[in-house]
Amino acid sequence: MALVTVSRSPPASGHSTPVGPTQDRVVRRRGRLQRRQSFAVLRGAVLGLQDGGDSNVASEADSEPMEEPSGEEQPTEDQTDKGQGLQSPWKQVQKRHLHLMVELLRPQDDIRLAAQLEAARPPRLRYLLVVSTGEELSEEAILLGVDFPDSSSHSCTLGLVLPLWSDTQVYLDGDGGFSVTSGGQSRIFKPVSIQTMWATLQVLHQACEVALGSGLVPGGSALAWATYYQEKLNSDQGCLNEWMAMSDLESFRPPNAEPGQASEQEKMEQAILAELWQVLDTSDLDSVTSKEIRQALELRLGCPLQQYRDFIDNQMLLLMAQQDRASRIFPHLYLGSEWNAANLEELQKNRVSHILNMAREIDNFFPERFTYYNVRVWDEESAQLLPHWKETHRFIEDARAQGTRVLVHCKMGVSRSAATVLAYAMKQYGWDLEQALIHVQELRPIVRPNHGFLRQLRTYQGILTASRQSHVWEQKVGVVSPEEPLAPEVSTPLPPLPPEPGGSGEVMVMGLEGSQETPKEELGLRPRINLRGVMRSISLLEPSESESTPEAGGLPEVFSSDEEPLHPFSQLSRAKGGQRVRKGPWPALKSRQSVVALHSAALVASRTRAFQEQGQGQEQSEPGMSSTPRLRKVMRQASVDDSREEDKA
């Protein structure tokens, strides 16, 4: 492990040094900006260390802010501990990358951790940064993703910005990877080693606990500084796609080939795919076999295709599934499956410009061609779709306003996407749930939202009804609601759409309660491992301190009777402005039972101590009385109880 110190100074200014009352504020500001940050460099990770007062040294020479003491190196250069001997190549590379990543930050922000991640396309390098700000004693943190074209590159780009809100959860995904979910966004990361993973999870756990204790929620002034980095996103589309990748996808878009670097295998697969359409169109699918399809392709291409048998079978199934076209529910809205979302020709033919992906396990196949909106949920009754329906309605309306069309899809186009289309119809056209379900099932008979989604649709129907009634009442009294009106924009029913070619002419209308059971789209997943639970289990393995019965006067301050109720952040104190400041190291989490027991013991001891003091005070004021302190304490408690009974009576 090596120690690296980076000197960070703001740009030189031509203004003179202020004098008078404002000088102290300027010096303090320079002390925050002109400082050095030290890092512990590990293989694959860089840990930020706490400043040990370097800011005071930097703020002393306020008349010459850019001047460095003799014997020290210039700003933005590093100083290693003992500074002797040749360093290994990986340390030199990490130090150079560290300098480049520091240059991406604002002067008041610090890197708490820089962890190297696995890259899907070497020689690219990826780093995950945990960045905190020094503004006003704030403990807010964000995650940044940094991309390097290769290890020798002298520049880097920003590909990810993820604020850490109070709802942040970290899950272990196996094989050294983990996912971070915050503010409705989920991102996956896979460090290059176990040591790097362990260092990263420790820093993430601390940042998540601070965010939870500070109550950081979207929509307020918290983490407003993250917009600075969101405006600086400049990685190429390939890097952005890698940061957006999901760990549990079952359907992937094909890899983006580098310009001019398509392999011979990819060229052959493209040729097979082009001919496969023609072969299937001219074959009797009820009698033809896979071997006969391959032999027909060999005749067309003039070469053996033994090594492409699995590719041909896979593409053949894909093409057959894509023959089930998406259902046109409204003139501007199609409802379909993942096969429809992967069929570029059909999407272009239907003039689709927006794709609403309601599946957790399906990737965005053409992010460079279409506008996507993702709602990452599973087809489970416990999944919550209702909070997303306002944004999905707005997304669909954006496509309609542009004169284009939107495809709403999930895995099979049966449950998640169908429920979202039903919610859209109820809000847009003022229909109730039964009317919307009849219309959608007429055009796509396989629609079957699960029971949990049906309950949410009924709740949504009540919300829309109440909103419309409230809107009408406000119009009667002449009050304009500041909220977005939920009244339908179009109240007239749509003309019936012609049935899709090749579709069934039967109308299958199912009741809400009597819908037939259909096979689930996905099997249930086993519970995910949460980082907070892992850290709690680790803390319980630590040897506990010797617990002896404390005396009344020797109780620790954390268990004082006048303190607020205990919470997991007992070492976070309130600073100016109501913000929390962390003091000292993070304590190990104790079991809830022991904390409750100790708190109860402390409360009893403190009350006993208070009774003793009151008893001693009365004994001094009434020296003629000969009762003992113990007897006096019992009598006082009895009198208090009697007075309470009299009050109740």
UniProtKB/Swiss-Prot annotation:
Its EC number is 3.1.3.16, 3.1.3.48. Residues 1-32, 49-90, 541-586, 608-649 are annotated as: Disordered. Disulfide bonds: none annotated. Residues 325-466 form the Tyrosine-protein phosphatase domain. GO terms for biological process: negative regulation of actin filament polymerization. The modification N-acetylalanine is found at residue 2. The modification Phosphoserine is found at residues 9, 38, 88. Keywords: Acetylation, Cytoplasm, Cytoskeleton, Hydrolase, Nucleus, Phosphoprotein, Protein phosphatase. Expressed in brain, small intestine and testis. Also expressed at lower levels in heart, kidney, liver, spleen and thymus. Residues 1-20 have a biased composition (Polar residues). Belongs to the protein-tyrosine phosphatase family. Protein phosphatase which may play a role in the regulation of actin filament dynamics. Can dephosphorylate and activate the actin binding/depolymerizing factor cofilin, which subsequently binds to actin filaments and stimulates their disassembly. Tyrosine phosphatase activity has not been demonstrated for this protein to date. PANTHER family: PROTEIN PHOSPHATASE SLINGSHOT HOMOLOG 3, SLINGSHOT PROTEIN PHOSPHATASE HOMOLOG. This is Protein phosphatase Slingshot homolog 3. The gene is Ssh3.
